[in-house]
Amino acid sequence: MALLLLEPATPVEWPVSFMLIALPLVAAFAHGPAAVGGATVFAVVLEGVLAGTPCCAGREVGYLWDRHYVASYICTGLVGVLGMILAAHRVRRERTLADVRFVADIAQRVLLRPVPHQIGSLHLESLYRSAAAEARIGGDLYEAVPTRYGVRLLIGDVRGKGLLAVETAAALLGAFREAAHDEPALPALADRVETSMDRRAVLLGGSEVGERFVTAVFAEIPLGEPLVRVVNCGHPPPVRIRSGEVCELDRGRSAPPLNLGVLLGEPYHVDAYSFRPGDQLLLYTDGITETRDAAGSFYPLLQRLRSWSSLPPRELLERLHQDLLAYSGDRLQDDIAALAVRLPAGEPPLPAAPPPG
């Protein structure tokens, strides 16, 4: 309608209908090749109507084939062809991206499947977010496995990015899920996982052998005992939340990261801490504590947890995620993962395993 009103007021050399040349390109941003082709035909027809109708052009009908209008038709057609090519390319990329996301979602469900919301009397929740906008999985990992020895937990962070980190995370999770049911002692579990990682690194060979190390925390909430055992392999220590008090479970006896222990020859140390009804345990990766605000200050995790001490695991991790996004201005610098475990008040510890036989 605006073109119909403006066309009579413009000189022949500069018809307003020339603006229709851009219509196919505009359509290419949101529609497929067929729709862009239809928009091109519509634009050329409308240009002809504006050029050949006296009431619109304010001139003789013969201007329908004036050289200026003919040039407009040709340009619109060429732009339409270009728009169809661009639209086809965009549609292919969107389909490829959708396929990649689909595969990534499947891989995430296999590698980082959600932990059970409840194991015995324990309530659990997990959080994972990749720093890459289109990524679903990366080098952070977590797992919770109910075993005859109790609930065994793992949180880890693989050095590096990309497929190398994903492959390493997959190998570590596979080793942990199997060994967690077999090894009676937590240090033996960590040692078996590291042995599996060492073997895999040797098989891969190359310069990656000494680079695939993983910081990790192995934790165990045993059956029939009000405590949590921790083996730390160069990872940020777990946090226990109790009646508004926040305490890092760290006695300064961290072992080297996985895949470096054999090189350094240091043993694994297991530390035990009380874990009573009402307590909550948070395991996390350093992507959380190393998140920075606009001024470059690190995220104050312990301070935040003190004000959220009464929240159950699901609400705690949701609040943590939203607060991290707000703190960083919606720009996470690193992958983040967290695992929250709570023993509700009034609930007894996990029941002891029945005697064999």
State each model region's role.
Residues 1-11, 23-65:
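Hydrophobic transmembrane alpha-helices
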Residues 102-191, 195, 209:
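Membrane-proximal soluble helical/coiled-coil segments
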Residues 21-26, 76-79:
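Canonical hydrophobic alpha-helical transmembrane segment
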Residues 1-6, 12, 34, 43-44, ...:
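Conserved subregion of the PPM/PP2C metallophosphatase catalytic domain
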Residues 67-68, 161, 290-295:
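Regulatory loop-to-helix N-cap segments in sensory/regulatory domains
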Residues 15-22, 37-38, 70-73:
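Hydrophobic alpha-helical transmembrane segments
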Residues 48, 52, 171, 175-179, ...:
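Solvent-exposed, amphipathic alpha-helical segments
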Residues 51-114:
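Cytosolic coiled-coil signaling helices that couple upstream sensory modules
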